[in-house]
Structures are given as structure tokens and as C-alpha cells.
């Protein structure tokens, strides 16, 4: 009798976990579908890095404009422009521009556009906590890397229940470092200049141009 009860309990628990995993996958699929439906996306964000053991605490703000695979990212005093073929990294402090090619087929290459859909592969996902943040219902999905060599322990992805937009991303490393990216503003289908993703060299007359390829 005890064995029957134990087996029944294990089966019920397995079904419950499977159902939670399926709910998480369905939610992530909805997020991906909605993001891909926009012509362009403009995001203002806050980035925090903390490691209590190493006494590290850093806060930064940034913004990114995306259209397809093109983007302009402003973060930590550096501007990165990707026009679909070349990557331009502009560093005013050093008066330098680095130009390089990007292999779009390289899955390991992290780009702003991939940050909104990175969770589609390489992770085991499950539903986590539901929080009320400033009147918004934020559903968290826990992502655990399937690669044992990954230095990240887990990622909590906060999703606005109503809009299905990503609210924040909390990444915990195996060595205790926690990084949090919080979306302060998420705008879509904005009027953009036709030269929004074009690098104009004449704007940087005294800069050193470093062409890597």
C-alpha cells in the first residue's frame, strides 16, 4: 500500500512539474511572438551588478534602439551601432571607433535583439514567483542553463502579465555575482530616421578608426 501511495505521489508530482514547464514555455513563446511583431523597439534600461563577497556594486543606465537585427546601443559611455553588416564601437573617451564584421550565424554572439529571445534554446524553464510591482503583475520564469560549463547558475526572467513584455532579467552566477537588467521604458513602432543605424564617419573627425577586418 505504501509503495502504491509513493508511486502515485511521484507521478502526480511529475505531472505537476511538466505542466509548470509547459506553462513557462507557452509564456516565453508568446513573448517571442509579440516582440517579433514590432517594426522597431526602443528601450531605456538600468543595469546593476552586485557581488557581496567581493564588495562589488555597480549601477549603470543605457538605452537601445532595435529594428530587425540592426541596433544602436548606448551603455557605459560607449555607443555601438550595427547596420546589418558591420559593427561600429564608438568610444568618446579614447576618441576611437572600432569597425568589425559580425557573423549572424554565430549563436554565441550576443546582440541586443537576441537579448529579447535568448531564452528559446539552451535552458530548462519553469514557472516561478508572481509579483506585484508598482501595480503591474510580473510573472517570473526560471531559466537554468543546460550546459554544465555555463558559469550562470540561473536566470529569472520577469514578464509583464498584461503586455507580455520583458520587465527585468536577474542573472545569478555560480560564484555569487548577481546582475539585474530592468526595463524602465519599452516603446514600440517609433518614428526613426532613415539613417538611424548608419555610421557617419564625418561626425568623428579626430577619432582613430580601427578596422579589424
Where are the predicted features?
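Gly/Pro-enriched, hydrophobic low-complexity segments
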Residues: 126-204, 209-212
